[in-house]
A protein has these predicted regions:
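C-terminal helical cap(s) of enzyme catalytic domains, especially alpha/beta-barrels
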Residues: 169-170, 181-207
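Glycine-rich beta-strand-to-loop/alpha-helix junction loops that act as flexible
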Residues: 143-149, 176-179
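Short beta->alpha junction loops/turns
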Residues: 28, 180-181
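Short Gly/Pro-enriched loop/turn and capping motifs at secondary-structure junctions
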Residues: 100, 148-153, 181-182
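Alpha/beta enzyme core
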Residues: 1-144, 156-172, 197-200
Length: 207
């Protein structure tokens, strides 16, 4: 059911010395409306205390799969989730890297315009990710992409590709937990250091 619940308070986090709070909203799930309201209220209070806010903006609904295509990581649908996330005052948004586009048209999720697909983006991975960035007030709210699950030997390559796409699209980072922490210490550290190298490399610029 993806029924995320609040199991602590912002004030408790503040009292323990935390400088930020995070939450997850599963947009499209049965509980998403409640999650949006609760997270919005929590983030409002966090900002009153001077804390930063991070939101995991994930899509969860069986209706997002149609005719054999999974639109849970579509650029337009994830972009809309990002927009709602920043509207309720997330300072950083975490989102899956787009794998396709056209979710609005395929499932009739809401109103859209054909120019979104013909003029605002292309099928290039960087352009699809850039559309996610644009939905965060044109990049003023940072986009961090997910590293995804571990696939073994290809993890280092996959992490570098995701980091390069995110950085060149105007994103601000990559979270790569499972790819790093499900490995021996040496391999996990190497993967994280390689991701850092991408963001520290001045020759990798916004496309």
């Amino acid at each position: 059911s993806y029924n995320q619940i609040v199991f602590g308070t912002v004030k408790e986090a503040w009292n323990m010395g935390a400088i930020a709070v995070g939450a997850t909203i599963y947009f499209g799930s049965e509980q998403s409306r409640r999650q949006i309201v609760e997270v919005s209220q929590a983030f409002e209070y966090a900002h009153e205390l001077g804390m930063a806010t991070i939101l995991w903006c994930y899509l969860r609904n069986s209706g997002f799969k149609k005719d054999g295509t999974d639109y849970h990581a579509a650029a337009d649908l994830t972009g809309q989730a990002n927009h709602i996330g920043v509207t309720i005052k997330a300072d950083i948004v975490k989102q899956k890297l787009p794998s396709n586009n056209g979710g609005f048209k395929a499932i009739g999720f809401g109103k859209t315009n054909e120019r979104m697909y013909t003029e605002l983006t292309t099928d290039h991975p960087i352009d699809l990710c850039r559309y996610q960035v644009a939905n965060g007030y044109m990049g003023r709210v940072g986009l961090i992409n997910s590293g995804g699950e571990s696939h073994g030997e290809s993890d280092l390559h996959d992490a570098v590709v995701t980091a390069v796409v995110n950085k060149r699209a105007g994103g601000m980072g990559l979270i790569s937990g499972r790819k790093a922490f499900q490995k021996p210490m040496k391999d996990g550290v190497q993967l994280l250091n390689t991701i850092q190298d991408v963001y520290l490399d001045s020759s990798i610029t916004i496309a």
